Amino acid sequence: MAHKKGTGSTRNGRDSRAQRLGVKRYGGQVVKAGNILVRQRGTKVYPGNNVGRGSDDTLFALIDGIVTFEYKTRSQKKVSVYPVAAE
């Protein structure tokens, strides 16, 4: 007879990868055209000036410039990119 108990196995121990959503570039940061600004599901933040929207609602910069978060209405946020003034 065995003097040690056999080790059981478990069916747990797996988890799915998180979706990595959220703001990727914050207000005041300098971005290049094509940089992702916000990854989101649905339009939590709307595209403003010089910002494009991908098929999965990802917002990205269309030009080089500075990121600004603004309010479209009282409750709707938008993100815009404004060109850096040449000095």
Curated annotation (Swiss-Prot):
GO cellular component entries: cytosolic large ribosomal subunit
Keyword Ribonucleoprotein: yes
Protein name: Large ribosomal subunit protein bL27
Residue span of region Disordered: 1-20
UniProt key word Ribosomal protein: yes
Taxonomic source organism: Rippkaea orientalis (strain PCC 8801 / RF-1)
Highest rank taxon of the organism: Bacteria
Keywords associated with the record: Ribonucleoprotein, Ribosomal protein
Gene3D superfamilies: 2.40.50.100
Pfam families: Ribosomal_L27
GO MF annotation list: structural constituent of ribosome
PANTHER family listed in its UniProt record: LARGE RIBOSOMAL SUBUNIT PROTEIN BL27M (PTHR15893:SF0), RIBOSOMAL PROTEIN L27 (PTHR15893)
Family: Belongs to the bacterial ribosomal protein bL27 family.
HAMAP family (UniProt xref): Ribosomal_bL27 (MF_00539)
SUPFAM superfamilies: Ribosomal L27 protein-like
A biological process from GO: translation
